[in-house]
Each structure stands twice: as C-alpha cells, then as structure tokens.
Amino acid sequence: MMKLIVLAAFIGVCAGGALPGYVAPQYRFAPDYYPEGRYRPNVEGNAAVLRSDSEVSEQGFRYAYETENGIRGEATGVESDGIQSQGSFAYTGADGQQYSVTYTADGNGFQPQGAHFPTPPPVPEAIVRSLQENARDEAAGIFDDGSYHEAKYDPASIAAKAQHQYHYQPNTRYFPRYHY
C-alpha cells in the first residue's frame, strides 16, 4: 500500500509540473541597462501640456504648443501649389542643452536650420576654379554636352591647343624604346 501511495504522489508531481503551452521568447537585443552617457528615455511619465493653440481654415493653418518639460513648437502654413509651411520647435536634449530648429517646407522640400547642425567643409580650391572655368566657358558660348565629338579629340587639334595655351614644345630628341 505504501508503494502505491508513493507511486501516486510521484505521478501527481510529474503531471502537475510544466504544462505544454506557448511561452514568448525573450527579446535578446533589448538591453537590461543603459550605459552611462547614452540617452535614456523618460519612462516615468508624460509632460503636461501648458499651451496648445490650433487654427485651421480654408486659407491655411496655424498651431503652437508648449509642455512643462520645455518642449515647444509653432507652425503656420498656406495652400499655394501644395502646402507651404514654416515654423520652429525647441527642446532640451539629454545633455541638458537647449536645441532649437526653424524650418521651411514647400515645393523645395523640408529645409531645417539650427545652430547645432553640422556645417559642411569648405569647397576645395580646385573645385572652385573648375566651377569658375565652367561659368566662363558657358558665357563664351562653349558648351560640353558630354557626348563624344571626334574633332575635339583629334591629336592635331590637341597639339595645336597645347602649343597655343601652354607653349607646348614637343620633344623630338628623345623617344624611349618600348620593351614588350
């Protein structure tokens, strides 16, 4: 009888263990912590809206908002060949610095401006000279459409240009031997 009770208890424990069913896998790419210096989103609550104005009419729209955590924005827009709008927004970054962006959005796209945006490097001098030369050629009526013109690449024509422009003098005394 004792063996029967032990066997029944063992079967009961085994049957009551893990029940078959779906268990969602843990997302392995989500970090459990955020290293220092990285942005950590504020998950403790939402900021209260201090001001929210909105006006929409057939002529266009206008809105403005401000929240208690320092986020603010405003925009106006009119319908003329699509929607043309301009506005600005500002917020405090994770580093404590105030960031402000003004923008224009129209047929030319979205064009933001801000003091914190990176500035492009200066144009190299060779490119500036090339652009100036292209402008001079265009003003003189010289256009290069990019297609091949045999006369333009004729060796006699190239030599004549070189002599005229650069005082090119061909070397007739020395010709290196070609070894194949």
UniProtKB/Swiss-Prot annotation:
Ranges of residues in domain Chitin-binding type R&R: 58-121
InterPro entries: CHIT_BIND_RR_consensus, Cuticle_Struct_Prot, Insect_cuticle
A cellular component annotation (GO) from this entry: chitin-based extracellular matrix
Keyword NADP among UniProt keywords: no
Signal peptide location: 1-16
Disulfides per UniProt: none
UniProt name for this protein: Cuticle protein 3
Organism: Lonomia obliqua (Moth)
